[in-house]
Structures are given as structure tokens and as C-alpha cells.
Amino acid sequence: MNLQEKIEDLRKRTLSDLLSVADEKTLNNLRTVMLGKKGELTEILKGMKDLTNEERPVIGALANAFRDEFGAKFEAKKVEIEQAVMNAALESETLDVTLPGKAQKKGSRHILTQTQEEIEEIFLGMGYEIVDGYEVETDHYNFERMNLPKDHPARDMQDTFYITNEVLLRTHTSPMQARTMDAHDFSKGGLRMIAPGRVYRRDTDDATHSHQFHQIEGLVVDKNITMADLKGTLDLVMKKMFGQDRELRWRPSYFPFTEPSVEVDISCFKCGGKGCNVCKHTGWIEILGAGMVHPNVLEMSGLDSSVYSGFAFGLGQERIAMLRYGINDIRGFYQGDVRFLEQFGK
């Protein structure tokens, strides 16, 4: 059998075997056996060394035609096998689209977010604007502009996270008082704003303290603002948050940036003022600090304190949420325990 006959015989056997191949592994093995480096065609073509110059091109062309034909049929067979595998998988893994799907668990806003939104809604209804501030603040705005110069003894009241000697994590949202007054055009009217945000203190975390918590600063500055305006504002806000039958008690206090300063207590919502474990049997619960803006704070913003006056207050979101919902450990707000948070989902 000459080379031409051997190639034709190999061609017929290869194409016949190709028709019966049913999987990709067998298909690849067939290509290796017939056309690989050690395959049958390679062995046949080793005999070309004995051919004449006229015979070699004929045999070479015949071998190339066989390779091209096999390559085309190989690719077609490969597609056929892949399609068969896919069809078999579809038949064995049929999806019943009428079956109910997996229900997605409903999420909700965090309880502190809800509390902040409720407070913001109350103040927006009273004509206040909401402003954002810097969590990384300067010593100048955090302390000095709040009537706390570098040698002021009241600085010992707060432990501070300092980044540099002049840059720190703000210890309260009060710096927004100065920043907002600096930017406000009082020739167009007074200022009414609240500034919610995170603040930081070097506290040891426990059931009632956290190194990070939330405050909402409130500020009103205009002509003829009095303590009566502060009292009326806070009375309205607290009754909206805790119920219309709540009463407020005002106690003298001290804050460097307000004068006079007060601590505001709310009548206990559990016992109605009779005394219980929530109010420590006093009938009252401390809720916030407030006061009239100190003349020095006004003057440092370029305002004439004999013409302008104002009041300021600070609300703690965590404290309000803890009192409203009977939560006794502040750490629950930050630990991300869904079992705790979903109780207050809305």
C-alpha cells in the first residue's frame, strides 16, 4: 500500500470513528491518535523521504487536505457534544418556575437614624435648617470659639482624641454654632439651625458610655431672643418626642458657651413622676443641656451682643432612643446584632 492509499485509508477510518464519538474526552483522544506528533499520520508521512520530487507535493497536499477536513468535522462534533451535554443538564435540572422563591428579609433604618429623622422633622416644621459639620475639627473651633481658651479649666471636663496639637476629633457638635454664625448673613434675618453628627470622647465603653456617640446641636440667634423662647421650643420638642403629658424641669448648670446655662429634666414617662427604677425614684430624668448663647461666643462671630442674643441646646440621640424604647445598654446601638436592631425596624 503506497502513501496515498495509506492516507486515504486513515482518512476513512478517522471520519468513521468521528461519527461514533459521544464525549469530549474520546474526541480529543481521537485527534491525538490520528494527527498528534506520534499519531498515525505522522508515521505515514515519515515515508516521504523515499518519494521522488514529483510525488512529494502530491502527498503533502493530500495530507493537508485531510487535516483541514478533520479539523472542520472535529469542531462541528465538539459543538454537537457540548449541546448534547447542555440539553441533558437542562432535562435533569428542570426548574419549576411555579415554586415559591426564597423570601428576601426586609431591612429597616437603624434606630438612631429613625430618632434623628424624627427630631429633624420636628425642627424643619419650626423653620430650622439642617447643617453638617466636620468630625475632624480644629482646636480653635472646638474649644476657643466655644469660650474655652487653652488655659480654661473647663477643658478638663472633656477627654479629647487629639490628632495633632491643633487638630482633633470633635468632642461636641457645638463648633457648628461658630461656623454657621460666621457664614450667616444676619442682615437678611436671624439664624435657626440644628447640626446632627457624631462626636468623640475618650470614654471607656460601658452600658452608658461610648467613645463615639451622636449629638444634635441646636442654635437660634436673632434680635430679642430670650430664655422664654428656649423654654417654649424645648417644651414643644420634648412633648412631640415623649408625649403631650410630659413636663420639663429646669435646673441651673454650667457650660462655658452659654450663660445662663441649664440642665433640662423630663417627667418620668414610666411612673408619671411618682418615682420608679427608671427615674431612680426622683420622678425626673435628665434629658439635655441648654442655655443662652454666651456673649463672648456672639462677639467672636462678629455680632454685637448688645443687639443680638440667642439660645443653644444639645440633644443626645442615643439617650433619647434609650429612654423612649427602654434600652439599658448603649453598646447595643453599635454591635450590629440584627436580633436587637430588628425590634425597632420601620
From Swiss-Prot:
| Record's keyword annotation contains Lyase | no
- Known EC number: 6.1.1.20
The note describing how and how many cofactors are bound reads: Binds 2 magnesium ions per tetramer.
Q: One GO cellular component from the entry?
A: cytoplasm
Provide the catalytic activity annotation: tRNA(Phe) + L-phenylalanine + ATP = L-phenylalanyl-tRNA(Phe) + AMP + diphosphate + H(+)
What name appears for this protein in its UniProt entry? Phenylalanine--tRNA ligase alpha subunit
Q: Which family does it belong to?
A: Belongs to the class-II aminoacyl-tRNA synthetase family. Phe-tRNA synthetase alpha subunit type 1 subfamily.
- Provide the residue positions that the database annotates as binding Mg(2+): 259
Please give the cofactor(s) recorded in the UniProt entry for this protein: Mg(2+)
The family database entries (HAMAP family) matched by this protein are listed as:
Phe_tRNA_synth_alpha1
Lineage summary: Bacteria, Bacillati, Bacillota, Bacilli, Lactobacillales
